[in-house]
């Protein structure tokens, strides 16, 4: 019976001393006794939930279903797995398989037990296998050259579906981006006053004309005039919460006159009036 107890505990009176920070299952549901008496009572019982996971099995081992599988060949060991077999010091932050299911032990014991269990379950380091059909056959004769595969030409319909609005012709009605597009649209930052599809179409056409000046000279396309956000001949109503360029430099008149002066006159006209 003494061999069934956890290593490091007294077989005659097994218990945890107060200050033990490990996990003791069922302790939170027990009361009325001291910490040592309660843990001793739980540990002296039959191997169950009170025992650490290393000395009990909650579920039977799960076996994979037997199915006809192709013959497999072992792959060579990858160099990255050698770090798990080396002596790891406390503070190692890498991943150790199955280490999160072991408690009440120091780092070295947890890692050693986790690696041993993982190696046994997977049949050693050479357990990595590859199906036979997935591995290329190396019995091809050297004189026999593989025939070049004929590349299938993509259909015109597929090319049209995969075409980007950047490369479409200016007359293509699909040369625009849908609302919500977060990519970069050249020249779009200088346009406003319309929906995003219309703005993106105008921006792409303008960018295409700037990129190919010879084409724009042969077939010039005049873009429509941009609509203005502010009226130039009328002032704005009081309590307008938007930004009015040049308004903060105006003073001495009503809000309507000041906004009219700021928006309706050019910089040269303002300098002449002063």
Swiss-Prot record:
UniProt keyword annotations, A-Z: Cell projection, Cilium, Cytoplasm, Cytoskeleton, Flagellum
Keyword Glycoprotein: no
Compartments it resides in: Cytoplasm, Cytoskeleton, Cilium axoneme; Cytoplasm, Cytoskeleton, Flagellum axoneme
Highest taxon of source: Eukaryota
Region Disordered, annotated ranges: 46-89, 119-171
Tissues expressing this chain: Expressed in trachea multiciliated cells.
GO cellular component, one term: axonemal microtubule
Stretches with biased composition (Basic and acidic residues): 130-155
KW Cytoplasm (keyword) present: yes
Pfam families: CMI2B-like
Protein task: Microtubule inner protein (MIP) part of the dynein-decorated doublet microtubules (DMTs) in cilia axoneme, which is required for motile cilia beating.
Similarity annotation: Belongs to the CIMIP2 family.
Quaternary organization: Microtubule inner protein component of sperm flagellar doublet microtubules.
Record's protein name: Ciliary microtubule inner protein 2B
Annotated gene: CIMIP2B
